[in-house]
Amino acid sequence: MIELNASSISESEQGENLGKMSFFGGFFEGLAGKNIPKILSIFSVFLSCFFILWIVNPEGVLFTRTTPTGGDLGAHIWGPAFLRDELIPNFRLSGWTPDWYAGFPAYHFYMVVPMLFIVFLNVGLILPVVILVAIGSSWILIQLIITKPKHWRVFSFAMCCLLLFVIPIHYGIAFKFVTVIGLLIMPFAAWKMGRLSGLEPVPSGMLSAAALAFIFDQSFNIMGGNLMSTMAGEFAFTLSIVCCLIYIGFLIKGVETGDNRALASIFLALTGLCHLLVAFFAVLVSLVAVATRPSRASFRWLSVVALLSGSISAFWVLPFWWQRAYLNDMGWEKLTSYSSYLWNRNELAADFLKNEPPLQIVIVLAVLGTLFSFMFRRRLGVVLAISAAITAFAFVYLPEGRLYNGRLLPAYYLSLYLLAALAVAEVFRLLGLLVDRNSSKDKNFGNLFEAGLGFIAVVSFIFYLAVPLRVLPGGSMQGNAYHWMGIETENLNLGRSWVLWNFSGYEEKTAEYETGGWEELVDFVVTMDDLALEHGCGRLMWEYSPKLVGYGTPMAPMLLPHWTDGCIGSMEGLYFESSVTTPFHFLMQSELSEEPSRAQRDLPYRSFDISSGVDHLQQFGVSYYASVSNLATTEALKHPSLSEMAKSGPWTIFKVENSELVESLDYQPAVMKELSHSKWLVPAVNSFMEGSGGVVKTIDGMDNWQRVTQEDAPELLPLPKVEISEITAGTDYLHFKVGQIGVPVLVKISYFPNWQVKGAYGPWRATPNLMVVVPTEEEVELNYARAKIDIVAMGITFIGLISLGLVARRKNSDDFSTAWFDTNLISQKLKETLISSESKNSQS
């Protein structure tokens, strides 16, 4: 029987010196010393990261000067460029844009930090500063390497990052790099989590393999975190997972020692700022970690970290929460095949999705890893196991609502992979102890044996993942089967081919489809630009068609504002949840497209109806309509309010008549009583579907306006015709003149509470999601301003950053030596109980 010395595997003793390490110290320490297990562990991480780089850079596309395309990713291109060109120069990280959805608050409800990374890489600094910073940073870097002061590795890494950020990088390359950086460093993040939490090199190295299993998971493609989801546009989610893994490492160590409050706060804040859904999992893990070792000190540690991370991220999170009533709910349908998604994955969303790696085997290993974690006092494993169980419970019992339960699956799967890796690592450790027990010469041979097994396991797993990716040297295809070294499989992981499609870019797409190709897309953009020069800038409603994938993604026309410098806006945009105009767009899309996407659930969609569609275009002040199908083009040519202006490839472009941005109302608006902004959608949709001939309904308004319930039919109270002139629209403002004051007019810009008006009363939210103002002066100005909550949030973040610096400089004086309860002592107490019971039995 192998005798296990609990003290030799205690987390606190294994992690005793970790607090003295720099952030990257543990990584480079193994390379500098002669410790073979550490070297093999680090080399495992290196191989894992290099393997990912090999996969995400097919044919060198990662470094080609092209514009990424493919799914949502191809539409994400708009965002960082708008941030760079419009928001940051105006000292904003969120603000108004007219480019999509008749205007919406950009980065108010979508994560801005990942986009900032792209901007920083793309812009760099101006050339003189580049030269000075490059010279200075290089000199400092050399001095750091020579003198090796305290924390020299951290400062050296910072200098390298600074050099990277000051050099301008092509926008497409910067975008591609940030897209995959989360994938590239996830194995390192998993390894670092293990080392911070007190694990030895071998199990930490195995965690990097667990990250690989998650990245190349073939069972989901839009939930977030794996390669396919990242290529679908969920790169912010992947970055958030990386931050979350490192935070968990600091968390596990922090509840035992009280160390690293500042660093833990930074990574928890980054987790939320990169993606809120991952932050929910981080909060869950935090509560579980403290529950496994509750004490006054651990509660204080977590409270400080929570307050710091919350205040640091307040500049974005607080306005998001405060104005959450203006979020759009896409109506995601809850996944109810519970046994499939949590156990065997035999009912997945698409034919190309597979149960790879096999989830049943992973779960068996994860259960074993959980038992080992309790037996051998691995707090990381205990916390992950409890968190995975709670996540699975939430997946089943979370009611259908705004939080789509499918988004919980990545955290569940990742936890299982990490636990499975811990199980395999423990088996290797036990085998190493067995070797040591039977070795009469070198008592360290067991450690080498364990390390060798761990390294071989990681390498073997990389080959296992490489086979369905079909990238191994010497591999060949015979029919649908891939052959390599006697191995035959028809399994195909689409990840690498998806990368090639996306990163080869818009520029490399050719007209292989009925519609498509870069040249055709460029001609369409140029045609719209030319029309705008002659007939004015404005919004475009383009017919949706699956055939548009020939451009790289059916969302390609969303980039018209990007390519026309904001002159031509697209009614459809990417950030569906960021605008309450989104459902009205999809209703129009359904009326004006032969094959609409109808992306939002539970809406009263109509089939193709040119009359209703044009009426709705006029309601939203849309200037142009572009048809691509024969049906849409034929019907549009017959409509009296549409004038054909140009043709471009398969597109026919029409001018929409009587569609100004400001319009006189026929009837007095009606204020809907007891209606909150969060309940706006249903009555607004009902009013929208009735057409433009009815009474505009509002939330709040002038005292003399009629008040109605949602069921009431408002009276038709005619208003005098108001002459409107000199309409001038900018990115975040609208100016116009009226010929008569005191009469309400409709402003066809999406409503948001940050809008302020000068020279009028209002603005009030009006159906479908526009604004009504009552001029008090001839000249009326609307401007998108900072709300009070925005200013308060920035102040809290400023205070948080100062507090972060103070906490980082102050040593935690709380006593972490005792706890009210500790899961790490369960096995010890159980062993003592068994020994005591055996002793009593022997005495009797």
Map each language-model feature to its residues.
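Extracytoplasmic/lumenal acceptor-recognition loop(s) of multi-pass membrane glycoenzymes
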Residues: 91, 95, 111-112, 268, ...
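Active-site lumenal/periplasmic loops and adjacent helix-entry segments of GT-C-fold
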Residues: 49-131, 153, 165-245, 249-250, ...
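Membrane-interface alpha helices of multi-pass inner-membrane proteins
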Residues: 250, 261-275, 287, 308-311
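Membrane-interface transmembrane helices that cradle and orient dolichyl/undecaprenyl
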Residues: 138-151, 239-263
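Active-site-proximal, structured, solvent-exposed surfaces of multi-pass membrane proteins
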Residues: 11-13, 130, 702-838
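Periplasmic/ER-lumenal interhelical loops and adjacent helix-loop junctions
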Residues: 70, 301-375, 476-526, 690-695
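Alpha-helical transmembrane segments at the extracellular/periplasmic loop-to-helix junctions
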Residues: 132-135, 237-242, 277, 315-316, ...
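Perimembrane helix-loop-helix junctions
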Residues: 281-308, 433-443
